[in-house]
Amino acid sequence: MSDTQQSAPDIFNTGLVPMVVEQSARGERAYDIFSRLLKERVIFLVGPVEDYQANLLVAQLLFLESENPDKDVHLYINSPGGSVTAGLAIYDTMQFIKPDVATLCVGQAASMGALLLAAGAEGKRHALPNSRMMIHQPLGGFQGQATDIDIHAREILSMRDRLNTILAHHTGQDIETIRQDTDRDNFMAAEAAAQYGLIDRVLTSRGASE
C-alpha cells in the first residue's frame, strides 16, 4: 500500500471501452459498458487504487444507495492496491451506506484491493478460482529533514495498526496473527483466502453465488 497519488489513465479516451446499444420505444441509446452495468448495480475497482478512482467509486456507491437503499451493490475487484487514504475513502463509504456491498475478486486483489475485498458484506465476499490475493503492511518512502522523516515514520506505523485492525475485524483473525502475516508480501490463492477469512466462498459458476 502506498499513500502517494497516482494519475488515473483515461480509458474512455483510448477508444477501448465497448459501447452497448439498447432499443426502446424512443429509439436507440448507447451506453459505455461500465455505465450499462452501473444500471445493474455492478461497479468496478480496476487498476491502482488512487484518488480519482476512489472518488468515482464513492460517487457510484452513494448514487446506488439513493436509487435503492435495500438492494445489494456488486463490486468487482482486479487491483494491485495503491493509496491507503484513497482505499480507506472507499472502505468507509462501503461501511457507511445502507445497501450490502458484495465483493468479487477477478484476477487479483492485492494490498488495499485485498482489504476492500474482505470489507464486503458478510457472506457475500467471493473470488473466482484462479484469482489471487495479497496482504502486506503499508509501504512508505520519505525524504527530507530528520524530524519530518520521524513524523512520517510514526504516521505509517499508526496507519499499519489501523489497517491490521480492519483486517482482523473482517477476517476473524486475531490482531497478532494479522501483524505477523502482513509483515511481508503474503500471497494467497482463492481457496487459501477463503480459509483465512478474506473471502467467504470461491465461485466456480454463476449459480454458485445464488
Swiss-Prot record:
Subcellular location: Cytoplasm
Highest taxon of the lineage: Bacteria
Pfam families: CLP_protease
Enzyme Commission number, as recorded: 3.4.21.92
Statement: the UniProt record of this protein carries the keyword RNA-binding: no
PROSITE patterns per UniProt: CLP_PROTEASE_HIS, CLP_PROTEASE_SER
Gene Ontology biological process: protein quality control for misfolded or incompletely synthesized proteins
Main location: cytoplasm
Record InterPro entries: ClpP, ClpP/crotonase-like_dom_sf, ClpP/TepA, ClpP_His_AS, ClpP_Ser_AS
Record flagged with keyword Hydrolase: yes
Keyword terms: Cytoplasm, Hydrolase, Protease, Serine protease
One Gene Ontology cellular component: cytoplasm
Active site, UniProt feature: S111 (nucleophile), H136
GO molecular function: ATP-dependent peptidase activity; ATPase binding; serine-type endopeptidase activity
Reaction it catalyzes: Hydrolysis of proteins to small peptides in the presence of ATP and magnesium. alpha-casein is the usual test substrate. In the absence of ATP, only oligopeptides shorter than five residues are hydrolyzed (such as succinyl-Leu-Tyr-|-NHMec, and Leu-Tyr-Leu-|-Tyr-Trp, in which cleavage of the -Tyr-|-Leu- and -Tyr-|-Trp bonds also occurs)
Top EC category: hydrolase
CDD domains, per database record: S14_ClpP_2
Assembly and interaction partners: Fourteen ClpP subunits assemble into 2 heptameric rings which stack back to back to give a disk-like structure with a central cavity, resembling the structure of eukaryotic proteasomes.
Family label: Belongs to the peptidase S14 family.
Functional description taken from the UniProt entry: Cleaves peptides in various proteins in a process that requires ATP hydrolysis. Has a chymotrypsin-like activity. Plays a major role in the degradation of misfolded proteins.
Name of this chain's protein: ATP-dependent Clp protease proteolytic subunit
Gene label: clpP
